[in-house]
Amino acid sequence: MDSRLTIVDVTGSTNDDLLEAGKQGAPHGTGLAARAQTAGRGRRGHKWDSSAGNLLLSIVLRPCVNPAKYSGLAAVSGLAVLEALEKQGLANEIRLKWPNDLVARGHKLGGILVEAARDNEGKPFAVCGIGVNVNYVPSEVPDGGLPAIGLSDLNENVPAIDVLLKEVYHAVVSAVDAWADLLNATEENAGPLAPVHGQYVAHLNWIGEHVIARSPAGDELARGIFKTVDAFGRACIETEGGLRSFHFEEASLRPLSE
């Protein structure tokens, strides 16, 4: 196991722990995994069931890019998690769901939470939290959410969680480093997803399908065909009135059939 990656039995939230460590100057690539969390959370503060038996990992990231580009980190990390699972022969049915989930068979397999902050010297950093259901599948379905599924439901032979942790950890750090290098080689006004845009869209769920965009409060914002996600991370929907784009803080998507 990499010396930068620490595994503990239980903590409140690995993201909270590393946000504090990051403020104290923890370096790029500092990783913390837990067997269980008592206060795990996802996007918009939703509770993340973090019982034992699943992959729970957070990583301090200090990519050498304009922090305004940090909005690309969730997509880059999601692709990296897919790559790590693919190396273990586990990714055949897994797709990315905009903006930050892993899904399979219409169920939620995992999620990614990226939180940006500044350390005590004013330097920017981010913490990327990754949760993947492996052996334990939460039974509770959040309002407007998808039911859960685990890697053990998709595959007969799932490696030990520590093996998966190592693969995911190294994949994410390597992917972020490569993304930062490529982003710095592009035009200054390029979108944060520019270096991985084609790859990201190719792995997205529901592209070309009819979807509904809903606000955080559950109100319908638009319905139409999910065309793509642009290089700035906005979901683009072709509606009867024309193309509309939504930032991840504005909306979430669901298939129209639901």
Regions found by a protein language model. Give the residues of each.
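Long, positively charged amphipathic alpha-helical accessory segments at protein N-termini or as interdomain linkers
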Residues: 71-93, 104-258
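N-terminal lobe of the biotin/lipoate ligase/transferase fold
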Residues: 1-91, 108-110, 115-118, 256-257
